[in-house]
Structures are given as structure tokens and as C-alpha cells.
């Protein structure tokens, strides 16, 4: 008898419970997030050195966790296409998945017709203005959005 055959009986392993119980899966995801959040602490401390008006995306979870992407252009593309500014090489990512746009001093993420959608803080969005610490999910990649110092041209004249 193979391991595959033995799963047909009443034997319930933890792996089966994790895969079939959504409540446990939600708890499991929260547990997974805790150690991953610790990995972004170094990135947060490096934010002070960012150019004014720019931002940083840090891959918190996914095939290239720990990677950092500087957002310093009016539009930054993300997707599985090799010409994307942020190349996310995984089948869960559309070739042209999302864009990060800087408009009026604020960054927003815009889904550009992806198959699996774009999420901000686990909520599906077509577009959303990003705040410091927001989590953007593109396919299986989770990226933390970190802002640099604001460029303050108004009211700073002495």
C-alpha cells in the first residue's frame, strides 16, 4: 500500500487539516506573517536614505523575498514580462500586472487587467492610493510599501 492509498482512510494528518480548514489556514497565515514582518525592519531603517518623493517596495513573501525595488519614476510597471520595471517571475503574475504611479505627491497602485488581481492589505483593488506600510499582493508576491521623506515645497520658505 502506498502513502497515497493510506490517505483514503480515517487517518487525518496535520497537513490535511491545514489544507481543508479555512479557519486554521487564516491563523496559519497570520503566524507566517509574524516572522516575515521582522525581515522588513532593516528596510524600514534604510528608508531615511531614500530620495525625497520616492518610495521602496520590499518583497516580504515570494520567490525573491528580501528584494527591494525603488519607486522613483512617474510610472513603474510590475509583471512577468521581462521588460517590466519590477520583474516578478511566477505563473501567478500576469505579464503586465500592475503599475505604481506617482501623482500629486502620492503613490498609487493600479491593476492593469491582471488575471489574478492586485490586493492592498488583502483587499482586491483596481487602484488604490498607498500609505506607508501597506502590503501589496501581486500573484504570490507580497510587497511592503515604504515611503521616503516627503518633498515639501510649500510653506518651507523662511
Curated annotation (Swiss-Prot):
Cite a single Pfam family from the UniProt record: FHA
Q: Which residues form the FHA domain?
A: 76-125
Give the source's domain of life in one word. Bacteria
Q: Which InterPro entries match?
A: Cell_Proc_Reg/RNA_Proc, FHA_dom, SMAD_FHA_dom_sf
- Give UniProt keywords alphabetically: Phosphoprotein
Q: How is it modified after translation?
A: Phosphorylated on Thr-21 by PknB. Phosphorylated on Thr-20 by PknG. Phosphorylation at either Thr-20 or Thr-21 prevents binding to target enzymes.
Q: Which PROSITE patterns match?
A: FHA_DOMAIN
Question: Where in the sequence is Phosphothreonine found?
Answer: 20-21
According to its UniProt entry, the function of this protein is described as: Involved in regulation of glutamate metabolism. Acts as a phosphorylation-dependent molecular switch that modulates the activities of Kgd and Gdh.
Under the subunit heading, UniProt states:
Monomer. Binds via its FHA domain to Kgd, Gdh, and the N-terminal region of PknG.
Name by which UniProt lists this protein: Glycogen accumulation regulator GarA
Q: What species is this protein from? A: Mycolicibacterium smegmatis (strain ATCC 700084 / mc(2)155)
Lineage summary: Bacteria, Bacillati, Actinomycetota, Actinomycetes, Mycobacteriales
UniProt lists the gene as garA
Amino acid at each position: 500500500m502506498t502513502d497515497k492509498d493510506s490517505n483514503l482512510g480515517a487517518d487525518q494528518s496535520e497537513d490535511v487539516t491545514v489544507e481543508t480548514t479555512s479557519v486554521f489556514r487564516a491563523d496559519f497565515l497570520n503566524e507566517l506573517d509574524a516572522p516575515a514582518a521582522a525581515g522588513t525592519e532593516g528596510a524600514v531603517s534604510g528608508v531615511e536614505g531614500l530620495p525625497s518623493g520616492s518610495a521602496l517596495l520590499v518583497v516580504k513573501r515570494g520567490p525573491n523575498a528580501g528584494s527591494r525595488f525603488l519607486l522613483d519614476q512617474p510610472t513603474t510597471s510590475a509583471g512577468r514580462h521581462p521588460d517590466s520595471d519590477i520583474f516578478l517571475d511566477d505563473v501567478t503574475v500576469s505579464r503586465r500586472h500592475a503599475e505604481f504611479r506617482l501623482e500629486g505627491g502620492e503613490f498609487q497602485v493600479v491593476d492593469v487587467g491582471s488575471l489574478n488581481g492586485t490586493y492592498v492589505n488583502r483587499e482586491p483593488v483596481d487602484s488604490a492610493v498607498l500609505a506607508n506600510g501597506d502590503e501589496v499582493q501581486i500573484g504570490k508576491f507580497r510587497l511592503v510599501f515604504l515611503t521616503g521623506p516627503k518633498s515639501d515645497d510649500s510653506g518651507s520658505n523662511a
